[in-house]
Structure formats: C-alpha cells, structure tokens
Amino acid sequence: MINTHITLPGLDLKNPVMPASGTFGFGDVPAAKKFDLNDLGAMVIKTTTPKATSGNPQPQIAVLDDGVLNSVGLTNPGVDQVISEKLVPLRKQYPNLPIMASVGGDSESDYVEVAKKLSDSDLVNALEINVSCPNVAQGGMSFGVHPDVVEELTKKIKDVVDVPIYVKLTPNVTDIVAIAQAAEKGGADGISMINTVLGMDIDVQTRRPVLGHNVGGLSGEAVKPIAIRMISQVYQNVTLPIIGMGGISSAEDVIKFMLAGASAVAVGTAHFNDSIASKHIADSLPAELEKLGIDDINDLVGQVKFN
C-alpha cells in the first residue's frame, strides 16, 4: 500500500493535493458538486477581506497559449459573510475536511481583523496569508516585496490567531529567499508559493491590453519552471514546510514539486481545462508513485539530485 498521507501544521492530509485559493470559490463552485471534496487533501477558500469587494474591471481573464492571465481581484462578500454564509455550510457538509482560509487586506489592521475572525470561528484549520495584496500605506506596493513588512505582518497575525499560518509568497521580487526567511522569523508555520507572475498581453487590433486592469497575474504551464526553481531555493534556506503551486496539471508535476521541496501542492489553472483537475491528479498519484517505485510520498520531499 502506497502512503500518500502528509502531516503539516494544522493540516492532516490524506494526500498532498488541494485547490489553489480562488480556483474553487468557497467550495461552492459547480465543479465542487461533481465529487466528494474529501477525496482531496484539503480545501483552500478564496481570499477574504474585511468588507465586500467587487474585483477589477472586465475583462478579468485572458487565456494564453501556455497559461492564463487574470486580474479578477479579491471578489468576496467580506469576512463576516464568508464565515456565516460560506464556511458554516462548508464545514457542516465536510466536518473532517482540512480547510485553509486565505487572508487579504489593504492594511496590516485589515489582515489582523480577518485572520482573528477566521481563527475565532473555529471553522478553519489553518490560514494562508496572501501578501500579494497592495499595501495602501506604502503607496500600493505589494506587502510581499519587503522582508521587514512580511516579518512584522506575520508577527501581528500570529499574536491574534490560534491556528497555523502559511505565508503565500509573491514571485515578483528580487530575492524570494529573503522574503521566506522574513516569514519564518515572524513566526510563520509554513510557506505557500508561488503566487502569480505579473504580466501583460496586448490585442494588436485595438492596441489595448487584453485585461481591463491592463496588467494581471500569469499562471499555468508557463510559470512552472519558475515555481520549481523558487521552491527549491526556499527549501534549501528555511525550515518551514512548503505548499507548492504554479502550473501543476498532473501527478508527475506533483512529484516534481515535491522533489524541489514542497510537502504538499495546490492546483489552480489546470481547472480551466478540467473542472475537477485536482481530484483527477489526486486519484492518479498512487499509480504514478508505484511506477517510480516510491512507497511513501514523504520520501520525495527535497530529494532532487543536483548536477
């Protein structure tokens, strides 16, 4: 019997596969009704903010040859409604499923408020801190690009929550290791990486960017080598477990990410082509491991053999 069980802070996973935040809503998208979410390792919900947000101007999504460019924004009904209208029914339907909530905001106080409310709800097992949000107090620069800001934000959140926190790193930085180390220093229990890579595409007929917001986050196949490289770098320089993401679309990809240093993975853009990709990947993982002669998936973590 092949072991796919993974134990992470706050998350007891039957397998390492979960949907990436924003790609499965609050467990209420049509695809989530096509299978039992207990078939996944965990459920990660859409980023939640203090008040309701409506997202960015249309068009918000552009499908490219090798990925997806999106500027959806953090559309959500606000933390109080997320708890009462989304998390309560999700937890009622899935009492034993590990649930990770994603936290966002425009200020440190926003993050602290949302994190505390979600932690106090007793409905989630862990929090993912989305530090790619623009920091209004710093002129709109992402929270996640300054190590000192990440460290301070992590500390403030840790002070008010009772569940483990995973800091989600943006790849749009010069030195991602410094950001990961800052999260570790601030008391993070884990790292989640990578978020989308900033990009833009242009319609040559109109000469306008294809997204209403002009720029957006690139995800999918195109970012996979970037994600693998960054995960490997961070794994070698911090002691925290890593949830890896960035272009995963197969069980073989899961193995690649784990060899680079991820202990678990999140599937996002693959759901555009296959609405239940995360389930299909989780289901096919044991056979892929057997093909490679691997009895315990935990033995893969960080075991890439460098040339």
From Swiss-Prot:
Its EC number is 1.3.98.1. It catalyses: (S)-dihydroorotate + fumarate = orotate + succinate. The keyword Oxidoreductase applies. GO terms for biological process: 'de novo' pyrimidine nucleobase biosynthetic process; 'de novo' UMP biosynthetic process. FMN binds at S21, K46, T47, N130, K168, I194, G220, G246, G247, G268, T269. Belongs to the dihydroorotate dehydrogenase family. Type 1 subfamily. This is Dihydroorotate dehydrogenase A (fumarate). The gene is pyrD.
